Structures are given as structure tokens and as C-alpha cells.
Amino acid sequence: MSDTPKPPSNTLSLKRETATEAPKLEERLHKVLAQAGLGSRRALEQRISNGLIKVNGDIAQLGMSVKSGDKIELDGRSFVASALTEPARVLIYNKPEGEVTTREDPEGRPTVFETLPVLKGARWIAIGRLDINTTGLLLLTTDGELANAMMHPSSEIEREYVVRVRSPEGEEHVQDELLEQLTRGVMLEDGTAKFDTIERIGNTDSHDWFRVVVKEGRNREVRRLWESQGCQVSRLKRTRYGSVLLPRELLRGQSTELPKTQVEALRTQLKLEKDMPLALTLQPIIGQRRSAKATLHVNRNDNNKHAYHNNHSTADESRELRRFDTLRDDRGRGQGKHHFKDRLTVSGEAAAKQAHKPFKQYKPKNDRSLSEGSPATFQSWYVPEGVSTGPRNHRNAGAGNGAHPNKKSPNPNTRNTPGQQTRKSPYKYPNNAPNFPSDHATPTFNPYGNPGQKTGAGRPNNSGGKYNRNRGPRYP
């Protein structure tokens, strides 16, 4: 035997070599929630202070940080903090009048988020806001870090607007002295504000058109600057945000996505690092269900002894089990077409809606015995006991009075004619009608008619043959 060691065999194993784990990303809780698009940072901080958010099972505190992998509970749903690995996306939206830049409006007005493309695992974050009467360029992104960098005043990103202004009272047009005042600066309620650039681009008999540029995103800043000088803004439209221009071919209410090259150029301009997950976001836990409404079951007949409370809905269970339902008709084992009456004919969801309904109780049937004096009690006088009258339609079986009025009666004088169907006779004698004892009192009377004789001529004398049965007594 040689002493050379054998080469190690390639065995299958599920274990992997321990790799150096990257440091976990850590960020403030309200920042992570805002990155996921669950609201503004100020509103989320208020919810954290109210104790409405939990982190790893404990109530979150204001100012705390979370790491990737932490479990966050909000509004009855669970999320996991994870690094944002997907590339940032930027959307250009041409906002029309009448829409507000918010996710939910308490007054029920339409919002810009109702017409945007649907995302999975992320939400659109508006870069700045436009009031309900302002139209034009509105940028939205999935990168919260990019949105904050573009909105922060320290970035000094230009916002360009086209505005139509009505001059102050007593003047036909806006004077140049007023424009110089707006470029130097005007004191507003929240501090000094100014236009970085003002350019006159046209005028009419009652209005003047200007192109203005600001580097801040205060609330209604452009309108308040003009109103401070006695002017009235009748139309306002944003045409540029930083290096992004509003496309001329983009109609109002439509959106288009910014190319990835321009998105990377924006990040480079704002000095944001490349290929680094600089933000945490929330990913929903797969397989979780929304908490169903609790139901209370009370049995009134048992004085609430068997009442119970559960935290699930039968309708939800039936909806999940409905895929296993097999709708079929159960037949009996014997011959014939006898089916069970209580076969499954509805879906599980429909059955769950009727689960708490009581069974239908039928009242006992009343006694249907005939009262005295009823004409039906005299049936024994018309038909004596022991006499069989045959089926119900025997009185209508004669010639000319068929049970089916639409069918023609066969000719009684012709029998077994080739090509003609022979009429069935239940009693197998010529007139297809029985003889009653009451008919014997008047032998010349035939209540069923005789096509061979006139009325009152008596019965035909069939003195033999197979029709000589059940003729009754003979008369001289």
C-alpha cells in the first residue's frame, strides 16, 4: 500500500463557507418609515411618540434607530427592515389643476398618487409639492435619500416657474421698480424671500407673463411674493426642477420615467455615493394575513350559556377553503333518477354567510278532513263502492272529446287502416267507456253517445264476439 494520501472527495453539503458579513446598516426609525412611503417624517414622529409603532415586540421610542433585520409592527402588519438594493427611480408627472400632492386628502379631493404607476415593495415619494391650483412639473422617486437631498435648501436647486400676473390696482402693467424689489428680497411671515431671476416674457391688456426662478421650496412662496406687492397670480406652472425639464409632448395628467443615466447624474450632482445602500426600507413579511374582525356567537335559547367569542371570521375561512370544494350531485345507488335533496349546490363562502341562520321550521299540517255538507262527501252516491271507474279522463276518451283538443280523433268507422295509428282503448270495447249501474235504469239512454245510432236509439246489439263482455242485464 502506498503512503500517498488520497485526494479529498467532493461530498455534497449544504454548509457554506463563512464569509465576512457586511456591517448592518443603521438608521433612525422615522427615516426608515418615511423611506418606505408611510408618511411624512413629522407625522411619523408623532405616531412614534403616541406608542403606535413597535420594534422587535417593544413599543418604539422617539429618536431610536433600527438595523437591517429588525421587525417593525405598524397598523396591525409586520415588516422587516432591509437595505434598499434596487436602483433609484425618478418619475416626471405633468400635474393638472385640481389635484393635491398628498396621499390621503380629508376633504376627498383627487390626489396625484391616484394616477401614478403601481409599485411593489416601494412607494413614490414626492420631491417637493405643488398646490391645488399650480400645474406643471412634479418629480417623484423611490429613493428617499435622493428626495431629501433635492428638497433641502442647502442644495440650492433651482425651481423655474412661468407665472401670469395681474398688475396692482391703478396700473396697466407691472412696473420695473416692483421687479427690482422682488429680486432684492421681501419680508414674509416665515422670513425673507426673493426671486433669484425675473424675466418678462410677454403681456396682454390685463396681464403680464414672467419667468421666475427660486432656490427654496417654501409653501406657496411664488404666490406670496407677488401678493406682497399687491399683484394677483392668475396662473402658475412649474417647468424645471434642477436639470430636469418638463417635456413638451407630455400631456397633463400623464407621467414618464427618467432614464437611469439622468438619475445617476442627479446623484452625482448631489454628491451621493454610488452602489451603496444608503437607506433602509421596509419589506412586508410573506404569508401574513390581516387580522379579521372578532365575532361573538350567542345562543338565546340556552340563556347565553353556550356563548363564545372567537377572533376569526368564518367567511375568511370559507374563502380559503373554497378552492377545495367539489360541486357535484350525489345520486342514489339504485336505478332511476332519484337524487338527494340536500346536495352541495353553493360555494363555501355562501354557506358561511348562512352558517348562523337557524334551520327552517315547518309548521305541522292541519287536519284536512272534509267538513259536513261538503259536496265531496257525496262521492259514494255517484260512484258506488266496489265499482272501478278507471282513469280520470275516461269521460273525455270518447270520439270527438279527446283528452288532447289539438289532436284529431280517428274515424270510428275505419279500424286498423294501413298507415293510421290504432287508438288505444283502456277498457277494450267499442265506445271506450265503462257501463255504470245507474245507466241500467234507462236502457235507451247512452250518456257517452253512439256514433252508429241516433240519440235515444239504445245500445248496439253486439250479441257475441269479444265485445260481448260486461254488457249488463238483457232486456226483451
From Swiss-Prot:
Residues 27-96 form the S4 RNA-binding domain. Residues 314-333 have a biased composition (Basic and acidic residues). The active site is at D131. SMART domains: S4. The keyword Glycosyltransferase does not apply. It catalyses: uridine(2605) in 23S rRNA = pseudouridine(2605) in 23S rRNA. Responsible for synthesis of pseudouridine from uracil-2605 in 23S ribosomal RNA. This is Ribosomal large subunit pseudouridine synthase B.
